From Swiss-Prot:
Coiled coil: none annotated. The lineage of its organism: Bacteria, Pseudomonadati, Pseudomonadota, Betaproteobacteria, Neisseriales. Belongs to the YbaB/EbfC family. Signal peptide: none annotated. It is found in: Cytoplasm, Nucleoid. This is Nucleoid-associated protein NGO_0742.
Length: 111
């Protein structure tokens, strides 16, 4: 099916793709995404590797939520979900560029 030269070239391409994907994953691990809830009253900054780096709660919300712990918890959770969704979307776009021309399932071998 493949000659020695063809198989060697294919392996070299696969190794190069794997190296490029590792570099992209390292960059994503440092790329910060912000999610928010309550029209910006709660903001969460996380990396595309899902490491939460910052939680910002508006002082106005803290005063308003003094008697409504559940509302504050809901807003924090919503901001976290927003950030996570954006992080996953960014990661999928970045990593998808490497595997878009491969047959289905083959790209999983490079992760």
């Amino acid at each position: 099916m493949f000659g020695k030269a063809g198989l060697g070239g294919l392996m070299k391409q696969a190794q190069q793709m794997q190296e490029n994907m590792k570099k992209a994953q390292a960059k994503l691990a440092e790329t910060e995404i912000e999610g928010e809830a309550g029209n910006g009253l709660v903001k969460i900054t996380m990396t595309c590797a899902h490491e939460v780096r910052k939680i910002d709660i508006s002082p106005d919300l803290i005063q308003e939520a003094a008697d409504d712990k559940e509302m504050l918890e809901d807003l924090i959770l919503a901001a976290l979900k927003s950030a996570r969704g954006k992080a996953e979307e960014t990661a999928n776009k970045t990593m998808g560029a490497f595997t878009q021309d491969l047959p289905p399932g083959v790209g999983d071998f490079f992760r």
